[in-house]
Amino acid sequence: MTAVAIPAVRDYLTDLQGRIVAALEQAGGEAFRTDAWQRAEGGGGVSRLLEGGQLFERAGVLFSHVKGTRLPPSASAHRPELAGRGWEAMGVSMVLHPRNPYVPTTHMNVRMFVAAARPGHAESDVFWFGGGLDLTPYYPFEDDARHFHRACRDALDPHGADYYPRYKQWCDEYFFLKHRNETRGIGGIFFDDLNDPGFDASFALTRSVGDSFLPAYLPIVQARRDMPYGERERDFQAYRRGRYVEFNLVFDRGTLFGLQSGGRTESILLSMPPLAQWRYDWQPQAGTPEAALAEFLRPREWV
């Protein structure tokens, strides 16, 4: 496989979505809704979602394969030579917002983008892969952070020992709220614009990232899901979820691309938490579990 094999990527992504949803349904004992949709400009997708669950207060596992005739500005900003080309984008993107504040929120995304060669021009299709997974705890545990990062490292090491440290640093830098001077969570891995190893190797690495999600996250869910909590923890969870909203609406490239490309708003904003709150200049009391989170919201080596 040397050309851009769009059907193979699509088959992998739809299978990944199905496997993840099946595992989450088994863990939570609640069924996800299925919402298939079409995009007038080209393409469509399938959204699998759950709202008001006992384990997951809001969860979305989304597949999309969309097309357009001209690259939107967010996609061509780093590649101005591709401006004006037709394009295809496909991926699986997911965000899970658990109900129990001791279970962390998580995000995972794997995707491929293709800028098509223009008829009559001496050029070829240009592809690149991207993705990653990251963890956003409210009441963090070092064991959870180390487990999550070990799973990320183990996914990437077969493709080269330099990938994990590079993509870990990229994640720390990407999921950073500049106006708050803090990371969104404890990181994970993040990559974009991957095509230099060639199509086969780039696709293989992306599959490893997607396949690593369940072993990275589900053991943490099982370890924390039955921890008792009360109004104090739920209140702090809602406050910290506000940071998630701030990042997604101000900095996230995927959100910006979706909105600029005329994407499906319901799918794009499914990453938002169901409840969030803001307070003016609130600071947790020193020595409390809430104050301990600040020590985790800065880049550090976990493995």
UniProtKB/Swiss-Prot annotation:
Gene Ontology MF: a single term: coproporphyrinogen oxidase activity
PROSITE patterns: COPROGEN_OXIDASE
EC number: 1.3.3.3
Transmembrane segments: none
Subcellular location(s) of the protein: Cytoplasm
Chemical reaction(s) catalysed: coproporphyrinogen III + O2 + 2 H(+) = protoporphyrinogen IX + 2 CO2 + 2 H2O
UniProt: substrate binding residues: S93, N109, V110, R111, G262, G263, R264
Cofactor(s) listed: a divalent metal cation
Catalytic site positions: H107 (proton donor)
Pathway: Porphyrin-containing compound metabolism; protoporphyrin-IX biosynthesis; protoporphyrinogen-IX from coproporphyrinogen-III (O2 route): step 1/1
GO CC terms: cytoplasm
Keyword terms: Cytoplasm, Heme biosynthesis, Metal-binding, Oxidoreductase, Porphyrin biosynthesis
Gene Ontology biological-process annotations: protoporphyrinogen IX biosynthetic process
Region (Important for dimerization): 244-279
Residues under site feature: Important for dimerization: H179
Enzyme class: oxidoreductase
Protein's job: Involved in the heme biosynthesis. Catalyzes the aerobic oxidative decarboxylation of propionate groups of rings A and B of coproporphyrinogen-III to yield the vinyl groups in protoporphyrinogen-IX.
Family: Belongs to the aerobic coproporphyrinogen-III oxidase family.
Protein name: Oxygen-dependent coproporphyrinogen-III oxidase
Lineage per the UniProt record: Bacteria, Pseudomonadati, Pseudomonadota, Betaproteobacteria, Burkholderiales
Encoding gene (name): hemF
